């Protein structure tokens, strides 16, 4: 490069921000000393296992059976080999195929891929996929309606995926009761797609979503984002006409883990098969008539036809998705139903307890909920969260961080690990704060 010293390499950095002295590093340490320092630094993190937690807003605290971790670390699965080459092992391919099968059964659609990065990228990919399939016959060319209650972090990803492709996003309005405005939804007929979430960002289940497909018609794709665990007790979107279903896979197989790694779910009807993103494993027979598994329709992908690929997804979440498949297999249909009922019961018990506090009210009292619910407080929700944190309780998510108009609203999330002791601690901490602000 023509440099004589290492300093020449950094000559374009302004003197005002260039560090010239040595780094403030300690001298050599023993392994024992390094471990002690590492533990001290890690102690600054908040461990969801160390205190009652009602934080959700996208990722869920969960219980992952020990068997999942044991199986996932076996050498047959945990390798440095990226599982998208055709010569990937039959065992890995079959495990991927089983994952697809379980996701397909879960959402009620015939086709699923081997995962996406997360729910947000899955939603964005579903929208672009729907536009590719529906735009030619759409009367509203390149238009997609998105629920006004999509969380801002997910909407941001959707906007990033669509803005360069000439896709116009319009808002699908909700009524003051939190439900989708079905009368207004008629305006979406003829668009490429409609994207809604069930439950929505407030944890509410909107029964009107089941009527959306009939309203928007067959020429417009219905995309539904789901809480995958809720499908143990809630009707599968494929039953009420969803064309594509996406969601966060994280509750199956892996904890929140500081935001990642996680994986997204993606399923669709056969109409979208050749335009869907990600890897697909197919089942066939070999020359001896034995079952064989293979990556199929790979020409959709960037490692085959970069200029014509349906998606640029590359780094793969397969190992994490297989952990989800292991978890789902261990649960089985009855276990999934019990898990969903347990979470629903915990949310209902927490809702009843919290709403018994004077000055606290439910945001939408007539809406059924799953996992999460939203309350209105007599003051700033962020202040309430800080107060409860000082009391040793992660009391939820202040929705003012997403929408300024909801600064007094608190999103409270529950899971299969929520206990009565946790609920009592939440009520005590929140009651203390309400008493202070109401004094």
List where the protein language model places each region.
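Gly-rich Lys/Arg/Thr-decorated short loops/hinges at beta-loop-alpha junctions or inter-strand turns
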Residues: 74-86, 104-109, 138-141, 162-169, ...
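Conserved PLP-enzyme active-site core in the AAT-like
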Residues: 121-292, 375-378, 382-390, 400, ...
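N-terminal entrance/gating region of PLP-dependent enzymes' catalytic architecture
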Residues: 13-98, 104
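Conserved C-terminal alpha-helix-loop-beta "cap" of PLP-dependent enzymes
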Residues: 334-425
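Short loop-beta-helix segment that forms the pyridoxal 5′-phosphate
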Residues: 84-88, 105-124
